[in-house]
Swiss-Prot record:
The gene is PTGDS. It comes from the Eukaryota. The active site is at C63. This is Prostaglandin-H2 D-isomerase. Glycans are attached at N49, N76. Monomer. One of its GO terms (cellular component) is extracellular space. Its EC number is 5.3.99.2. Disulfide bonds join C87-C184. InterPro entries: Calycin (IPR012674), Lipocalin (IPR002345), Lipocln_cytosolic_FA-bd_dom (IPR000566).
């Protein structure tokens, strides 16, 4: 049996080599610029391991989100989406949780703590985000999200999201591009 000091040394070495990565340590957009991330985004694509998502993905539709600065250095993420033929608006408080581009929030469904990382963005067209739940007794909740500045992301962006989601272990049937719904997505250019 390994001594406690050799066990810690082994874990430290694995962490240094990048073998043990947490969502916050997973790749982040280099030199993330929070001010360029602000503004309107559309949730254009999703992938998740959630049983709820897999059951409901055929009835989900695109939502509009507004990212605004919060006093604590994080973001207020206000999303408007269609639910039961009504537009519903909800706001999440994204709190800084590490280097720029890494945030945490409390799920409105169950109160669990989640970490979201902006993995890649060009700020003008798309952003790829990865969300994961903290330690829990069951399987970790994971989600990949494609944000786009327009309601119709191009083929290259869609392909980039598909590759991004698959690289995080999501299968083809766990990836969905959300259809537009005219009711809640006014453009306001």
């Amino acid at each position: 049996m390994a001594t406690p000091s050799s066990l810690w040394l082994g874990l430290a070495l694995l962490g240094t080599l990048g073998v043990l990565q947490t969502p916050a340590q997973a790749s982040l957009q280099p030199n993330f610029q929070e001010d360029k991330f602000l503004g309107r985004w559309f949730t254009s694509g999703l992938a998740s391991n959630s049983s709820w998502f897999l059951e409901k993905k055929k009835v989900l539709s695109m939502c509009k989100s507004l990212v605004a600065p919060a006093p604590d250095g994080g973001f207020n993420l206000t999303s408007t989406f269609l639910r039961k033929d009504q537009c519903v608006t909800r706001t999440l408080m994204l709190r800084p949780a590490g280097p720029p581009g890494c945030y945490s929030y409390t799920s409105p469904h169950g109160g669990s703590n989640l970490e979201v990382s902006v993995v890649e963005t060009d700020y003008k067209n798309y952003a790829l985000l990865h969300t994961e739940s903290g330690p829990s007794p069951g399987p970790a909740f994971r989600m990949a999200t494609l944000y786009s500045r327009s309601q119709a992301p191009g083929a290259a962006v869609r392909e980039k999201f598909t590759a991004f989601a698959k690289a995080r272990g999501f299968t083809e049937d766990g990836i969905v591009f959300l259809p537009r719904n005219e009711k809640c997505l006014e453009e306001h250019e």
